[in-house]
Regions:
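Non-catalytic substrate/cofactor recognition surfaces at enzyme active-site rims
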Residues: 1-116
Length: 116
């Protein structure tokens, strides 16, 4: 059972009043090493899938960069439920993590010259 603390709600109400606006930072070093930073706690499958799709020698994925926007569960995790996938602790829209990973992938491919 997920523990809920109503007294914590005011702490997040102001922060997320205009919705969740996560930050994404992507850098590519020598065409071999991708650095991806996001402002939140992303479920590990996001980074695993990104690494498989990016096709660079090394990909380093960092959470908690330039802010913190709670949890970004995978769509599958939301469907399964459980800690971190409940909207009480994950105010991001379902699929937001996948959208951010797609943006990161596009940026990596642009830096590699594969997409203009």
């Amino acid at each position: 059972m997920l523990f809920r603390s109503p007294e914590l709600i005011p702490n997040f109400a102001d922060e997320f009043a205009d919705g969740v606006r996560p930050r994404l930072t992507v850098a590519l070093l020598n065409g071999d090493v991708a650095l991806v930073g996001v402002s939140g706690e992303f479920f590990s499958n996001h980074s695993i899938r990104l690494k498989e799709r990016a096709r660079v020698k090394q990909l380093f994925f960092f959470g908690y960069c330039n802010g913190y926007h709670q949890y970004f569960p995978t769509i599958e995790a939301v469907a399964e439920g459980g800690y971190g996938a409940d909207n009480a602790v994950s105010p991001a829209a379902v699929g937001a993590g996948e959208q951010i990973m797609n943006s990161a992938l596009i940026w990596i491919y642009q830096m590699l010259g594969k997409i203009k």
